[in-house]
């Protein structure tokens, strides 16, 4: 049989400021000149779950080109510590910054950030704050936060359409959120 196939990622727990974070590092393929590493900045909520397989496929493709990829589940997501409702933008930014530091400490350095949807916004913010990351790859970046939030809330509306007493508008959900109430959207 020829070829070993794709290399399995190195899976480990990265220490975040509030607990252990699931991390998977896809190193550059053996025999390929290393070009450095990128950090994947995932999309938000259900979009993150729907993109997991694609992110792994892309990380393997980058590996074949000599680019390592670190995928981190921020606090309260995936297999990381915490509950989703406890996560904040600031917390997730800190968690991804810990990923950048991990890449720097392990020799190849962080040459770029790869962000998908709302993760693209996070990647741009991280790059500006860090000041030393030369490359950004932004897939389908969110350009209008209000529109994104409305689309996100529509997931909940769709789930309640058949219920007579269900929430019927994104305005109702916005009012709950503005009052400090948690709004469950999709589980």
Regions from the PLM with identified roles:
Residues 36-39, 112, 135:
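Structural motif
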Residues 114-123, 140:
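Gly/Ala-rich beta-loop-alpha elbow adjacent to hydrolase catalytic centers
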Residues 18, 26-73:
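Short, surface-exposed "cap/lid" segments of acyl-processing enzymes
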Residues 45, 74-79, 143:
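Alpha/beta-hydrolase active-site loop signature
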Residues 1-31:
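An N-terminal hydrophobic leader/cap segment in hydrolases
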Residues 132-187:
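The alpha/beta-hydrolase serine catalytic core
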Residues 77-110:
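Catalytic nucleophile-loop/oxyanion-hole region of alpha/beta-hydrolase
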Residues 125-129:
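Active-site signature of alpha/beta-hydrolase-fold catalytic machinery across serine-
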């Amino acid at each position: 049989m020829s070829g070993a196939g794709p290399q399995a990622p190195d899976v480990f727990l990265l220490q975040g400021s509030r607990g252990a974070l699931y991390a998977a590092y896809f190193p550059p393929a053996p025999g390929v000149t290393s070009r450095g590493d990128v950090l994947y900045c995932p999309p938000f909520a259900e979009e993150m779950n729907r993109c997991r397989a694609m992110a792994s496929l892309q990380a393997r493709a980058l590996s074949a080109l000599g680019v390592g990829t670190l995928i981190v589940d921020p606090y309260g997501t995936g297999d990381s510590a915490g509950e989703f409702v406890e996560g904040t933008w600031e917390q997730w930014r800190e968690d991804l910054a810990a990923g950048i530091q991990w890449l720097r400490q392990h020799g190849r350095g962080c040459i770029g950030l790869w962000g998908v949807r709302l993760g693209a916004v996070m990647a741009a913010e991280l790059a500006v704050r860090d000041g030393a990351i030369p490359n950004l790859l932004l897939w389908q970046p969110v350009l209008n936060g209000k529109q994104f939030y409305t689309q996100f809330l529509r997931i909940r509306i769709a789930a309640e359409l058949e219920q007579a007493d269900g929430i019927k508008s994104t305005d109702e959900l916005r009012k709950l959120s503005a009052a400090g109430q948690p709004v469950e959207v999709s589980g």
